[in-house]
Amino acid sequence: MTLEQQSQNSLLNSFNETRNTTLQLVKNLERDDFGVQTAVFMSPPKWHIGHVSWLNEIVLSKTQQDYKFFSEELSEYLNSYYNQFGKPHDKSKRGVMSRPTVDEILEYFEVITNRVREVISKPLDKETMYLFTMAIHHECQHQELLVYDLQHLLGDQYRPAKRNESPISLNKEKKKIRINGGLYNLGYSGKDYCYDIELPEHKIYLNDYQIDTFPVSNAEYLEFMNEGGYDDYSFWLSDGWDAVEKNEWNSPMYWEKDEDQWITRDFVGKRKINQNEPVCHVSFYEASAYCKWANKRLPTEAEWEKAALWNNEKGVKTDFPWGNEKPTESHANLLESNIWNCSDIGSYENGKSNYGCYQMIGDVWEWTTSEFVG
């Protein structure tokens, strides 16, 4: 469905679903959890739910004549980096603020939800519909951020509102796929919503390359660790080795050594590392070092995208690895799957790409060698 074709009901339903998902993520938190900031790179839960409401209010102010803000004082705290709306509060100090209170933020969330519902229940022009669609996608982005902040904040103490079982993987044989190079159109050219950083679509030349069909597993990463991967500087970029020594890295974040085995504390609980799950919570430097140890390399953004989206038989790029059908629970492990841990490598047969690559979306974010210059 294009933006031009999107109905009022579709926009309203998407908005309601998104707001409900945000509330579900914090449903089982204690009041004391909402304001805690455990690291400079994360934000307190109350900031996230306030910030997504603030962005919706910015859209309201841009589209509604004589709009009156709920509270001018909230803006500085809830602004992230939009200097045109005032000086943002220092991100590293979001957790030192006891005001606004959790109750004030939750009230703000409810008020803005109702204000947006009232506006988008009526006919909208194209520009207004686009801005509210952008706000929905922005909130989905912060749901991802909220989840990884909850991992850092609570780990195995977090209780999701709903949990489903992970599918059983019947495919454990990792292969290398050869992909022919040539000119490739990187970026987006469709009519659905996209971020400006996905534009414009442009041609890029690729050499022939090979890519694994599965993400790197915990078992594979353990081999790197057991063979001294964190002790041998020759595998590491210079900045990466500095980080290893400064931070005393010896494993992925959230891994702990318990006598003779590695365990983790995640949304499932305190548990032994599942060797069939994709390795996660590793930095770019760790991913790069692993690849050098394994005599491989990380793909570029364009190489990754072609392996994920290019249908070589039809000569077209698809919206998703499996085609243009919207994601379902049979395609990928996404937030709405409510699984709350990674699925085993080789899961989601229906979600593999035309080249045969699995889990190209869902489960984990994947590193590339391409620098983000947006």
Task: Please give the residue ranges for each predicted region.
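N-terminal regions that are enriched for targeting/export leaders
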Residues: 2-32
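Functional-site microenvironments in short loops/helix caps that host divalent-cation chemistry
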Residues: 135, 139-141, 145, 149, ...
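Active-site rim elements
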Residues: 5-11, 96-106, 129-132, 207-209, ...
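Short, contiguous alpha-helical
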Residues: 32-87, 121-169, 213-218, 222-223, ...
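Short glycine/proline-rich turn/loop motifs
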Residues: 2-4, 89-99, 122-123, 199-205, ...
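Short, helix-capping/interhelical loops that line the mouth of catalytic, cofactor-
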Residues: 1-10, 60-113, 155-166, 261-266
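Core segments of cupin and vicinal oxygen chelate
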Residues: 224-228
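A non-catalytic, amphipathic alpha-helix used as a structural packing/dimerization or gating element
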Residues: 13-24, 104-111, 115, 141, ...
